[in-house]
Amino acid sequence: MQQETSTPAAAVPSNATPAISVRDVTVHYGSVLALDGASLEIAPGRVCGLVGMNGSGKSTLFKTIMGQTRPDSGTVAVNGDDPAVARRTGVLGYVPQREAVDWDFPVSVRDVVMMGRYGQLGFTRRPRRVDIEAVDHALERVELTDYASRQIGQLSGGQRKRAFVARCIAQGARIMLLDEPFAGVDKRSEATMTRLFRELADGGATVFVSTHDLPALPELADEAMLLNRHVLMHGSPKDVLQPDNLAAAFGLDVMKR
């Protein structure tokens, strides 16, 4: 196992339960080592940007936090609970990469957002007024009210991502994992989501975002995390995004471009 050289983020009160806690997690896919003793904590009310090259383990880390991938060793807690509990109770929400979604599926934007309410529907499984209002509110927050009846695949890349963010909001998720939400999005969607993530964090939610957009990190995130199978560094974007740290995460060739 490689030695972790992470720098702690802002201090968390000793009695506060971390929103996300990962301890010495190792994951293999067959003979391929995806995570090697990864450890991290993210406090409630923070936006954290996850940075690493392709194959560094970002998606595996998210899947492990979601409980979709079982680690070979180590522990994961979400709001102090098992990830499965956090998902079942709606505490944990997830926005997948665009490649993971069938955009031709015959479902409207409103239907996608309503999926966030499924765990809270009553015995009849029919949306109640409270569910409809939650969906309306979520659509308004991501500026998609006028697109609610459109088939999801008819939206632009940025609008699609905003629809899945709205699903998390309608769900009432307090911890959100977003896998490359800014990949292939328009400037309006990027600005809308950046503003929204800050509003959600100011309201006590935790937003964990993987991104390749390094220049945008200081505006987007309270803290940044460099990953290369384990956490290389975790702290403020200014401290983390230093040339030596990025060289360790991406390799010297990247830094020379």
Spans of model-derived segments:
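The feature captures the beta-strand-to-loop junction immediately N-terminal to the Walker
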Residues: 51-53
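Helix-to-loop junction immediately C-terminal to a conserved catalytic motif
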Residues: 66
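Conserved ABC transporter NBD signature motif
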Residues: 74-88
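Conserved ABC ATPase "signature" region
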Residues: 114, 128-147
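Conserved ABC ATPase signature
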Residues: 151-155, 159
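Catalytic Walker B motif of ABC-type/P-loop ATPase nucleotide-binding domains
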Residues: 176-180
